[in-house]
From Swiss-Prot:
Coiled coil: 289-471
Pfam family, one: zf-XS
Protein name stated in the entry: Factor of DNA methylation 2
Superkingdom to which the source organism belongs: Eukaryota
């Protein structure tokens, strides 16, 4: 749906409801600002001719638009209704802004010209120079000469003519058609007038008057005169009054202002529509983020419930195991008590002795069977405990995997524990029960059937898990191949100045070496010494016979760390300081983690902002957003 469709959905009755969103945005000054540089303005009419308002003017403007005619869109009305509420509730005490300085119109000659005072336009000046016998006629007819002579009036063009009937040289200087040209032409006339050589003196001169140059502005009588001067003026110019030119300029300016005002109004309307669409999109995005947060919270709660259920199941198994162990101990005590009673009796006859021996033999056999059953039970218990611990560890490692694999793994673990429990119970039943006891045989058969069902179910789960693990390994292989291709493609393109880039893991940082050498040597010697020292330690890092590591911790928690007591490291720290020592130590840790067998630096995708290995998702996101900006900066 485009913006026009969204506007059409806002009815007159919904204007009050839709004004709430721009009202909150005005209060927070997130998108709209009413106060700009200490002045009040309408944020929804940016670009209008009137920008600065007094408080009452702006309030009247907002109220008028919100209750305007049908030509106003519902979006405009809702926005200006929000502005009116904002002024009433939040800016009621705002001081009146300083008035803008008035625009001073250009100073013009306020004296209206007489009807006969009509000028030639574009503005022109006339200079006539009677020719004396001593004058150089060819020089006076040179336009370049007159252009230099009249240069202080800045004419754009000068033309010289020979007027045969008056034996004079006529010069016409053309000026700019704007008011600066008019000022230059009148300045030329005033210059000759102060010298007593204007048009009036030229027309009133006597025959034997002094031969000198005369000058004035070209007017209607000059335009209508005969001769080369009149012909040139009628060809190159027209007759205009100052008021006509001023009126035409005002009309042109007003026309231009109207066109620009309409363009600004249309642009403001489009801007308001785009702003409204942006606000709706921002609100939709916020709802999506809230839903995502709720889903994440629900997933965390579900995971917690599953962990609690697994813990209760393990506790039940341990309780049943303890119960079986107590029952075995009780039966062993009963047998021992019976054996002691049998030993006290003396056989009076051989038959009784034989019977007593037979009872002892059976008692010993039963005792051995019980001991064997106890050992089997103990083994089963230990197996169950180990299995519980192993499953618990696997479960903690698999919490970050997909939920389907987690449920299947929990089911498999439960089946394995039940199978181990059934095996333990069967071993106990075999050693305790009598082969002729039908109830025992029936119970053992049921347990065997249940055990077979559990094994079959376990095999199905293992088959499914095997398929999933195969897919996971394939995915891991593809991910590693993708990482290598990204490393090859981004190497040299990105560096530590960007958030995501390629880092050489295990590469020695040369800066600490250069810093410490600058403190001991001159500038040139420091570079040489730093390069030599750094090269030496790069070779030491590549030496596989040097293993400055030790193991800390026990069992699965043991890890390799740098041995601070290594002689070479201790010597390096004494001679070159802690910073150089830490640089070598950091390179050792990275090399031991990423390429312990090869002992040479390797490339890795790195998140420089957080100081850790970057995920493929982070790299892809960075490429899609920041690489374009980076390329534009480089071009």
């Amino acid at each position: 749906m485009d913006i026009s469709d969204e506007e059409s959905e806002i009815s007159e009755s919904e204007i009050e409801e839709y004004s709430k969103t721009p009202y909150h945005l005005l209060r927070s000054e997130t998108y709209y600002k009413v106060k700009v540089n200490g002045r009040l303005r309408c944020p929804f009419c940016v670009g209008k001719k009137k920008q600065d308002y007094k408080y009452k003017e702006l309030h009247a403007h907002a109220t008028g638009v919100s209750k305007g005619s049908a030509t106003r869109s519902a979006l405009q009305k809702s926005n200006h209704l929000a502005l009116a509420k904002f002024l009433e509730n939040d800016l009621a005490g705002y001081a009146e802004p300083l008035p803008r300085p008035p625009v001073v119109p250009p100073l013009l000659d306020e004296t209206e010209p007489n009807p006969h005072n009509v000028y030639v336009w574009p503005w022109m000046g006339i200079v006539v120079n009677p020719l004396k016998e001593t004058d150089d006629k060819e020089l006076l007819l040179d336009s370049v000469y007159w252009l230099q002579t009249l240069s202080k009036f800045k004419p754009v063009e000068v033309n010289a003519f020979w007027v045969e009937q008056d034996s004079i040289v006529g010069v016409i200087a053309k000026f700019d058609s704007d008011w600066s040209g008019f000022a230059a032409a009148t300045e030329l006339e005033k210059e000759f007038e102060t010298q007593g050589s204007c048009k009036k003196e030229w027309t009133e001169r006597s025959g034997d008057s002094e031969s000198k140059a005369y000058g004035w502005c070209a007017r209607a009588d000059d335009f209508q005169s005969q001769g080369p001067i009149g012909e040139y003026l009628s060809k190159e110019g027209t007759l205009r009054t100052v008021s006509d030119i001023l009126q035409n300029n005002v009309q042109d300016r007003n026309t231009l202002l109207d066109v620009l005002s309409n363009m600004i109004d249309m642009t403001n309307e489009d801007l308001n529509k785009a702003q409204h669409s942006y606000n709706r999109t921002a609100m939709s995005l916020q709802r999506v983020l809230d839903e995502k947060k709720n889903l994440h919270q629900a997933f965390a709660e579900e995971t917690k419930k599953m962990q609690q259920m697994s813990l209760r199941h393990i506790q039940r198994i341990l309780y049943d195991k303890e119960k079986l162990r107590n029952e075995l101990d009780r039966k062993m005590r009963d047998l021992e008590s019976r054996a002691k009673q049998l030993e006290k009796h003396e056989a009076l006859t051989e038959l009784e002795r034989q019977k007593l021996d037979e009872d002892k033999r059976k008692s010993d056999a039963m005792n051995k069977s019980l001991q064997l059953a106890s050992r089997e039970q103990k083994k089963a218990d230990e197996s169950v405990l180990r299995l519980v611990e192993e499953h618990q560890r696997q479960k903690e490692d698999a919490l970050n995997k997909i939920l389907l694999l987690e449920k299947q793994l929990d089911t498999k673990q439960t089946l394995e524990m039940e199978i181990q429990e059934l095996k333990g119970k069967l071993q106990v039943m075999k050693h305790l029960g009598d082969d002729d006891d039908e109830a025992v045989q029936t119970k053992m058969k049921e347990m065997n059937d249940e055990l077979d069902d559990k094994k079959a179910e376990l095999e199905d789960l293992e088959s499914m898990n095997s398929v999933l693990m195969t897919k996971e390994r394939q995915s891991n292989d593809e991910i590693q191949a993708a990482r290598q291709k990204m490393i090859a493609g981004l190497t040299g393109l990105l560096g530590a100045e960007s958030d995501i880039g390629v880092k050489r893991m295990g590469e020695l940082d040369e800066k600490p070496f250069l810093d410490v050498c600058k403190l001991r040597y001159s500038a040139n010697e420091a570079r040489v010494e730093a390069a030599t020292l750094c090269s030496t330690w790069k070779e030491n890092l590549k030496n596989p016979s040097w293993q400055p590591f030790k193991r800390e911790g026990t069992g699965d928690g043991a890890e390799e760390v740098v041995d601070e007591d290594d002689e070479q490291l201790k010597k390096l720290k004494r001679e070159w300081g802690k910073e150089v020592h830490n640089a070598v130590k950091a390179a050792l840790v990275e090399m031991n983690e990423y390429n312990a067998s090869g002992r040479y630096p390797t490339s890795e995708l790195w998140n420089f902002k957080e100081g850790r290995k970057a995920t493929l998702k982070e790299v892809i996101t960075f490429i899609s957003t920041d690489i374009k900006n980076l390329k534009r900066k480089r071009t």
